[in-house]
Design a protein with these regions (language model features):
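Active-site environment of divalent metal-dependent phosphoester hydrolases
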Residues: 10-14, 55-59, 81-83, 121-125, ...
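Glycine-rich anion/phosphate-binding loops
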Residues: 54, 92-102
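Divalent metal-dependent hydrolysis catalytic cores, especially in the metallo-beta-lactamase
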Residues: 31-60, 70-80, 112-126, 154, ...
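Acidic/histidine-rich helix-loop elements
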Residues: 13-28, 83-94, 126-134, 208-217
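Metal-associated gating/positioning segment near the N- to mid-region
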Residues: 2-65, 84-86
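His/Asp/Glu-enriched, well-ordered alpha-helical/loop segment
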Residues: 150, 222-282
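Histidine/acidic residue-rich metal-binding segments in metalloenzymes
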Residues: 98-118, 123-197, 218-239
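Short, electropositive alpha-helical surface patch
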Residues: 59-72, 132-138, 142, 167-181, ...
Length: 282
């Protein structure tokens, strides 16, 4: 039976104002907001949600409530990010590998479902081909993934740029999130590793017509990522639909992702197999 899933959401965010959204949950997770979110997903037929994490416990609380709505909910707790690099606004930071290893061990003991790592910057939506910062050193990427796997935890990686995705895939990362600016080599590495790619096209496609960023650059970014989605599908790679719901202009329950994936040429078989693997691994 086909499962309706969103493989990348953020319960802590609302798609409108990330700072105000975080304030909503800072003292304690807002049950009214979370219940409304889960109810809306259930009414749309979703039965599986995978959270990208937050350090205030909104995703953890959503997991506790989700069964009431017939939803299987998976969360890493807080995403783990290197101090001074992208992700600190929402995740838990570390400075050394030993500190990271301690956070992984703690997450496992607390019952988190998997590990989320931040290993690259974000797309600059006003400059095609530009990321907000370089990716993490390949050796460090491999080490982070190895440590998490040795703890028995699957790894979800925020990763943009082929230089970042290739070592992550070669290290056996379980899923790559976003994946802007890839290459044929990066696609092959993901295919060989059985890595599921969750392109989150909505985070780019939903910006069109909003007037906040360069329309030309947004369209070029979407076209570029869509091209690699098509190529990955042709080589038999595994894809899964994840909206990054909660990101600006991506409300919870957004249906744009599957439309954008199909427009890019993603085959239903690739999406079904990729979603099934996400559910199995995470």
């Amino acid at each position: 039976m086909q499962v309706k899933a969103d493989c990348h959401i953020h319960a802590v965010l609302d798609g409108v104002d990330w700072k105000a959204a975080i304030r909503r949950h800072e003292r304690k997770p807002d049950d009214a907001f979370l219940r409304n979110m889960l109810r809306n997903y259930a009414e749309q037929g979703y039965t599986y949600l995978r959270d990208g994490g937050d350090r205030w416990g909104a995703g953890i609380r959503a997991r506790e409530l989700a069964a009431e709505y017939g939803i299987t909910y998976r969360t890493p707790g807080a995403p783990l990010c290197q101090k001074g690099h992208y992700g600190g606004f929402i995740g838990t930071t570390y400075e050394t590998v030993a500190e990271y290893a301690g956070l992984v061990s703690s997450a496992r003991k607390k019952g988190c479902d998997f590990i989320k790592i931040m290993i690259s910057g974000l797309m600059d939506f006003n400059q095609f081909g530009v990321l907000t910062e370089p990716g993490m050193h390949p050796a460090r990427i491999r080490e982070l993934i190895r440590i998490a796997h040795e703890e028995g935890m699957a790894v979800m990686a925020h990763a943009n740029g082929y230089e970042t995705v290739i070592p992550a895939a070669e290290a056996g990362v379980d899923s790559v999130e976003h994946g802007a600016y890839l290459s044929e080599e990066a696609l092959f590495a993901m295919k060989e590793a059985g890595t599921v790619w969750v392109p989150t096209l909505s985070t780019v496609g939903n910006l069109r017509g909003k007037g906040r960023f360069s329309e030309t650059d947004i369209c070029r970014i979407l076209e570029n990522t869509s091209y690699y989605v098509n190529q990955f599908c042709k080589m038999g790679g595994l894809l899964a639909s994840g909206t990054d719901a909660g990101a600006w202009a991506v409300p919870h329950g957004s249906e744009t992702e599957i439309l954008l994936l199909h427009q890019a040429g993603a085959a239903q078989e690739s999406l079904q197999k990729g979603t099934a693997k996400i559910i199995e691994k995470f």
